[in-house]
Structure formats: structure tokens, C-alpha cells
Amino acid sequence: MNIKWKSQLLLFMVAITTSVVSAYSGFGASNAMIESAKKRELNTTATLIQSNINEQINKASARASLVSSLPSIKQAFRAKDRDAIATRLLPAMIVQRDQFGVREGQFILPPASSFLRIYALKDGHGEDLSGFRQMVLVANRTGEPQRGMEIGRRGLSIRAVYPVKDDDGLIGSFEIGLSFSSVLTQTKTNTGFDVGVFIDDKLMTEVAQLIPRPDNERIVGGYQAVEVTDWTALKPLLSPAIFAKVRDVSTELITLNGNDYGLVLVPVLDYKGERIGAVVAVRDFSEFQIQQRWALTGNIAMAALQIVLLTGALLIVVNAMLLKPFEAIANASKDLAEGKPSSDLEDLAVRKDEIGDMARSLQTLQASDNDRNGYKESQNA
């Protein structure tokens, strides 16, 4: 194989190596950005779930604080006048229920005896709540507001229990309970994740006796689905192993049937900070898979184009600057050795590099050879 073909093969290999390295680096950078976007989505969703829970707790507290501080309510509660309380609160509480997710409003006498349920005026008068409503017991015992999540007869609620006091002292307490659905709806609206809240099945069975027990398929790893945005979206990704991880906020990427999914777990803590369940959020991450495939395809196509362009450019430059001049010098040297008139090297001789030096040297040799030939001819004459 002559130098021309060796050099062209070498240039082709250099172009391939350069293009492959460039494509690999480009895909690596694109893939890193996509993976970072996935993690950012997961972390943002986890933060938003926690923020939404805290927001609902604050809303429950604001409502309970407002009602418990109204003078007319204090007066009616002290007089144990249920009709007066209902007349003052029921219209506003119906609006709160229908538009803002308030599911419970209840007045409670110490230590934990139900006095009036706003949304069930005739039900539960005098019911003893002390066996399962620790928030109420603590609020009535300490006279301090209690806020957070707790399971009641009608299931899980985001609650705030505020003492009702007048100049004569503690009368009892007023409780607001919000549905968890607001947390789920806000999260899905803002992130696209389908969300569900899962609570310890044993606790729900023992306490939430006014709601039906869910189907067995909605009980996973000892946790039952209390509220979900879309059960069909969550179901394939749930397993006992997932709930075994619910000790802290965690995120995970799961591949199922060739599709990537993002999964977020946020522990549900009761008002005492004890874990009673988890919020699970999932989202189809196939859009990121498509981006990764496009990145791979684009980098491969770019590498192929780069190989063609780089090889062509290198061949043009090397042929013009080196191979063609070397070929001309080689032909001139061969002609000189055979005693033939050499090719014209004037174009190469004007160059200020090594090729120009070689061309000028050959011109000098050619001139010397011509002089010797002329001398011999004159002697022979």
C-alpha cells in the first residue's frame, strides 16, 4: 500500500475516532441533562406535596381559630345552645364544604364528648371520642390548639382543634377537618403526577367505622388507598416493597413494560409526628425516553455527517498541500535519475517550506546535470 492510500486510511480513522468521541460526549451531556430533569421533576413534586399538606393544615387552623374566637359562638357554646350555633354557622359552613373541601366542623366538650356536628346536626350528641381522638383530648386538656392529620370515624382528615374560651375559662373546643383531596388535586394540576394517599389499614379499620372498607386490591402492603386521583395509573406500580421504604421522603425511577415512571413517596405524619401512611405520586416519564432516543439518533446522525465532512476536508487539504507536491517531486526525481527532462517545479520552488526546499534542490541538480551534459557535448564536438 503506497503512502497515498495509507495517509487516506489514516485520515479516515482519525475522522471516525474524532466523530465517535464527539458524539459520545454530546450524547452523554444530553443524557445527563435529561436525567437531571427527571430528578428535578421528582424533587419538585415531593416538595410540592409537603407544601400542599402544610397549606391545608394552615387553612384548617385559620378557620378553626376564626370560629373559636367569635363572641357569639362562645356565648352560644357556653349556654349549650345548639340551635344558636347552627343558625350562625351553618350557611357559611355549607359554602366552606361545597367550595373549599371542608368536610367536618364539630364542637366538643371536655374531655372529648361530641356536642354538635355542623354537617350532621342531629347525630352524635354526647358521643365519647376519647378512645380515638387524641387531638381533641390534648386540646381540651392543655387548652392549646392542635393541628395536623388524624383518623376519625369518617376517615383521614387534615384537622385543627382550637380551644373555645371565655372569661370564665375553657368551654370546649372547635374542630375543622379538611379533605385530603385538595392536596391530591393541587399536586396533579401543578405537576401532572397522579397521586394517592395510603393509610395504615389497621388504624383505618379500628377507627374509621363510618366508611366502607375498600376492595382488597386497594390494600397494598398493609396500607389502604384512602383517596386517589386515578387508581389505574397508580395500581401497576404499587407493591409492599414500595411501602416498606416509607420512612422518609424518597424518589425513584421505575421501568415497567419498557416504560419509565417517576415515583415519589412522602410519609403521612399525624399531629404527633408519627408515621401513619404515605402519599404516593407517579407519572409516566416516556417523554424523557423519547428525548433520550432523539438525542441518541441526533448524535449518531451528526457523527456520520462529521465523518464525511471531516474526512473530505482532511483529504482535500492533505492532497493539495502534501500528496500532490510529493508526487510531483517524486516524478521529477525519477525523470532526473533516468536522464529525462524533469517536470516543471517552478510552482513548488516558490514555496517557503520543506517542499519548496526540495523543489529548489531538484532544480539545482537539474541545472548541474544540464551543465555537465553541455560540457560533454562541447568536448565531443
What are these regions (language model features)?
Residues 81-92, 118-150, 181, 192, ...:
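Extracytoplasmic/periplasmic sensor domains and loops in membrane signaling proteins
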Residues 321-367, 372-373:
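HAMP signal relay modules and closely related sensory coiled-coil linkers
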